[in-house]
Design a protein with these regions (language model features):
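Beta-strand-centric surfaces of beta-sandwich/beta-rich domains
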Residues: 1-156
Length: 156
């Protein structure tokens, strides 16, 4: 059973009419960045469609992702200096059963992704996005380790 101790909601804004083949990169996410005395380990991610996430929490004028966009998007995550998770279909990250959207019934948590570089991670489109700007909301579950001694790390 997964237990959530730390959670961060991250929104990836998709411009209207994003062309096929385009990549939309994440912005810097300070809360989820490793620092000299802090390590972040991502344990799981979820994505929410507009039926469960209607509008952006940052600016409620941008709508949530329509279910029809899901088949157009694949995710690539840059971990430990390489694109270690490449072109994962977005549907793999949807864990809520919704008649309008594909989802993964028995999902597999990530293998504790440490050193995930959000600035180099992106969504790639195999078809043009809708004519309306929207956000893809990612629910990030993670562990934060703080340095206690020269070689000792403890969960914070």
């Amino acid at each position: 059973m997964l237990r959530t101790k730390r959670f961060e909601l991250v929104e990836l804004t998709v411009p209207a009419n994003t062309p096929a083949g385009s990549r939309v990169q994440f912005n810097t996410i300070p809360q989820l960045r490793n620092q000299a005395n802090q390590r972040i380990i991502v344990t799981d991610m979820s994505v929410y469609v507009d039926t469960s996430y209607g509008n952006s929490q940052v600016t409620n004028s941008i709508v949530g992702m329509p279910a029809a966009e899901i088949p157009k998007i694949a995710m690539t995550y840059y971990v430990n200096g390489e694109e270690s998770i490449k072109l994962m279909p977005l549907a793999e990250l949807i864990h809520i059963n919704d008649a309008s959207a594909p989802y993964l019934q028995n999902w597999y948590p990530f293998a504790d992704l440490e050193n995930l570089d959000w600035d180099k991670s992106y969504a790639q489109f195999n078809a043009a996005s809708s004519g309306t700007q929207y956000v893809i909301p990612f629910g990030i579950r993670y562990i934060r380790l703080m340095q206690k001694g020269s070689n000792e790390w403890v969960e914070a």
